[in-house]
Amino acid sequence: MSIGILGKKLGMSQLFDDKGNAVPVTLIEAGPCRVTQLKTTTLDGYSAVQIGYGLSKDKHINKPEKGHLLKSGEELLKHLKEYRVEETTSYEIGNQITVKNFEVGQKVDISGKSMGRGFAGYQKRHGFSRGPMSHGSKNHRAPGSTGAGTTPGRIYPGKRMAGRYGGKQITTKGLLVLKIDDQKNLLVIKGSVPGKPGSIVNIKPNNVVGKKGGQKS
């Protein structure tokens, strides 16, 4: 499994294809990231590469973290991410990870924290249908029945109800890389990605999950 890269979502825009159709895209400032640690099967029980992204002030880093980061470079980094790999021989501590690791036309999986929408009702949070708006109805956006009475006499866990909407770590898979600007460390991704502008996202090569029986999809 190859490693990914950390970046910052800048916002959305649009590009035009050969036929003149507008294609919505997301701009991501990806990297440069620094390799901060290499984990091996002998010492750690598994092989992994840890990278860091984003500068941090000295007052926000404690002494153990500072000692760990200074082993790979002079700059203190704010965000760390670890990627499992088969072997770490092709990486060295202090190496730079940039957008050059990706290619135009490649599919990627992007993880981030979705935009929080606060306390939301049934219609907005789950897409439930509303009740009649006229003819004397008093059930416009109410939930309706949430379960039986005597049996089971309670609401089962996991029942879809009103509550906090968004603000969770999610992954959007199979997004297409349309353009790469290695001078500005930019990735242009087709479609939307999790998070609001300015949020940190994790971009990694698309992980193809096999179907039942081990067949590739």
Swiss-Prot record:
Spans annotated as Disordered: 127-162
Keyword Signal: no
Cross-referenced PROSITE patterns: RIBOSOMAL_L3 (PS00474)
Pfam families on file: Ribosomal_L3
InterPro entries: Ribosomal_uL3, Ribosomal_uL3_bac/org-type, Ribosomal_uL3_CS, Transl_B-barrel_sf
A GO term, aspect molecular function: rRNA binding
Top-level taxon of the source organism: Bacteria
GO cellular component, one term: cytosolic large ribosomal subunit
UniProtKB keywords: Ribonucleoprotein, Ribosomal protein, RNA-binding, rRNA-binding
Self-association state and partner proteins as the record states: Part of the 50S ribosomal subunit. Forms a cluster with proteins L14 and L19.
HAMAP family cross-referenced by the UniProt entry: Ribosomal_uL3_B (MF_01325_B)
UniProt-recorded name of the protein: Large ribosomal subunit protein uL3
Gene name of the encoded protein: rplC
